[in-house]
A protein has these predicted regions:
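Extreme N-terminal leader/targeting segments of oxidoreductases
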Residues: 1-54, 72-73, 77-78
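C-terminal catalytic lobe of FAD-dependent flavoproteins
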Residues: 3, 330-449
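Flavin (FAD/FMN) cofactor-binding and adjacent substrate-gating region
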Residues: 3-29, 105-110, 134-214
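Glycine-rich Rossmann-fold phosphate-binding loop(s) that bind the pyrophosphate
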Residues: 58-62, 84
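Glycine-rich active-site loop/strand segments that organize a redox cofactor
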Residues: 90, 94-124
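Helical element adjacent to the flavin cofactor pocket in flavoenzyme catalytic cores
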Residues: 161, 168, 193-253
Length: 456
């Protein structure tokens, strides 16, 4: 690799390939979920040279689950988990906090034709939610984790037609749901904006930054977590792999990549991932008078009927706020700062369309969060090269699918077997992206916004 470090930079092990990592997450400090929590203690930063049994790169849902499961299955093993930021400020702590059992976009007519495939995907996601539910309960993690389900809501005729397709899809796979008319929507949401909704009961809502912070602090004792430790170089070997950070290194015979859209920077999956940033804004805490004027339920999550519409959370953990999330942008390098104000202007319009009586309530935080898609919707799971394993690209179902894929990857590494593992291994691989991918994403995003209309 051009410009790569030499063997002498990595110590005494023999390596087949050295690589300078050339793609990094760059996050600002305006993640509302993180900022409304108590300040973190100073992190443990990787310093010096560490040798262990496993190195896991990436402290999101997949990395946390993989590290935990490796530690559970091999209590005598030493596991190093490395993240380039603080847990909670990374991508895992920047989502809307929908821990879903089936994808939001089951609206397609063709979905009902793939009954067995859809039911298998839902079972896989629910296994991830069950593992999280068990872990959160066992360690008493305070993160607002509650099985409230999710609402899919429409505000236009087009949106109502999409809800009809969604209901047909749910009927075809024997999934239960409840339909709300306009009056019921107003009663639940505190606004007359929505004309119809479907409530799917099996998803969870969560404060994502609080959850991943709790998952990190409750890791087994044989997991060493290092934060603010960006991996800058990697050496792949026949016997050992070594990763370097600014102040240290970690070497292990087995390397686990839980790096999602940044995996390209480590030399894998070139031109196969679509890196996006989705944007959200959160109000300041509502006053008692504002809450009374708003009415509605104190906590809920809304997914727009149209895929390009606005997601909404009314949040009570740790306090009373409203979050709106819409629009996405293409970015390999997590350029959050320059586009944050652009996103906030769009969110302000969406917020005031829904709650004009709260027009004076300002946003306190606006931020972006990275996610990764593949063009054909397939994930990456398994061995990327000898003794380098990866679970990457969860296509918008990161909390559930990222968790179960990290758990299953750990089980695969140590030789555990299960039907779920076979299902994961049987999945396809991402196909190659089309030329001018970034331009295509931008055109697609603009077209979707225009079609979404009032539902944005």
């Amino acid at each position: 690799v051009s410009g790569a470090p030499s063997d002498s930079d990595f110590g005494t092990y023999e390596y087949e390939e050295h690589r300078k990592v050339d793609l990094f997450p760059v996050y600002d400090q305006n993640n509302g979920w993180q900022e409304i929590l108590p300040a973190l203690a100073e992190p443990a930063v990787l310093t010096g040279d560490v040798t262990c049994d496993y190195v896991v790169i990436g402290g999101g849902y997949s990395g946390l689950a993989a590290a935990r499961r490796l530690a559970e299955l091999e209590p005598g093993a030493s596991i190093v988990l490395i993240d380039g930021d603080r847990i909670g400020n990374n991508a895992a702590g920047r989502s809307s906090g929908f821990a879903i059992d089936h994808a939001h976009n089951l609206r397609a007519r063709s979905f009902a034709d793939a009954r067995a495939q859809a039911q298998a995907a839902i079972a896989m996601n629910r296994a991830g939610l069950d593992y999280l539910d068990q872990t959160i309960a066992e360690h008493n993690i305070d993160c607002g984790w509650v099985r409230e389900g999710k609402y899919h809501a429409a505000a236009t005729d087009r949106g109502e037609r999409m809800l009809g397709h969604f209901a047909e899809s749910l009927d075809a796979i024997d999934e239960d749901y409840t339909t709300l008319d306009a009056a019921a929507c107003a009663h639940v949401f505190g606004t007359s904006f929505y004309t119809k909704a479907i409530h799917a009961p099996h998803s969870y809502l969560v404060q994502p930054a609080a959850m991943v912070r709790g998952l990190a602090t409750s890791l087994p004792e044989n997991v060493s977590l290092f934060e603010d430790s960006m991996v800058t170089d990697v050496a792949y070997g026949t016997r050992m792999h070594t990763v370097k950070t600014e102040r240290g290194s970690a070497s292990a015979p087995i390397l686990v990549m839980a790096t999602n859209g940044f995996t390209e920077g480590f030399g894998f999956l070139q031109k196969q991932l679509i890196p996006l940033i989705t944007w959200g804004s959160m109000t300041r805490e509502l006053t008692p008078d504002e809450s009374d004027r708003l009415g509605g339920d104190p906590s809920y999550g809304i997914i727009a009927a149209h895929p390009a519409g606005t997601s909404v959370r009314r949040v009570t953990t740790p306090d009373n706020r409203i979050l709106v999330r819409n629009i996405f942008s293409f970015s390999k390098r997590s350029d959050f700062v320059t586009r944050r104000h652009w996103a906030a202007k769009t969110h302000r319009k969406s917020f005031e369309n829904r709650w004009p009586k709260l027009a004076a309530v300002p946003f306190e935080h606006s931020w972006g969060g990275a996610l990764s898609l593949s063009r054909n919707g397939e994930p990456v799971f398994g061995e990327l090269r000898p003794n380098v394993y990866g679970t990457v690209v969860h296509n918008g179902v990161g909390i559930a699918r990222g968790t179960i894929s990290g758990k299953l990857l750990a089980e695969m590494i140590v030789g555990e077997d299960s039907d779920l593992l076979h299902q994961m291994q049987a999945k396809g691989r991402p196909n190659t992206n089309l030329p001018f991918q970034d331009l295509g994403v931008r055109i697609n995003a603009r077209a979707r916004r225009l079609i979404a209309g009032l539902e944005e």
